[in-house]
Amino acid sequence: MARITIEDCLKRVPNRFLLVHMAAKRVRQMREGSEYLVSSPKNEDIVVALREIAADKVYVSDNMPDEL
């Protein structure tokens, strides 16, 4: 995948505040040991999280506890 942009992510998550919340939560999950959902070698966790969101691999669940 080429360079990831916020616009790519906003196509999947139209609310930019929700996008930031999702990316932060996903980074936290990865740092706690969760596996990456997309292949993205040599990238920082935030870039991987945004790639996952743009690829529609991450979604919001109503049952998800809010830890932010």
Curated annotation (Swiss-Prot):
Gene Ontology CC: DNA-directed RNA polymerase complex
Keywords, sorted A to Z: DNA-directed RNA polymerase, Nucleotidyltransferase, Transcription, Transferase
Catalyzed reactions per annotation: RNA(n) + a ribonucleoside 5'-triphosphate = RNA(n+1) + diphosphate
Gene Ontology terms describing biological process: DNA-templated transcription
Function of the protein: Promotes RNA polymerase assembly. Latches the N- and C-terminal regions of the beta' subunit thereby facilitating its interaction with the beta and alpha subunits.
Family: Belongs to the RNA polymerase subunit omega family.
Official protein name in the record: DNA-directed RNA polymerase subunit omega
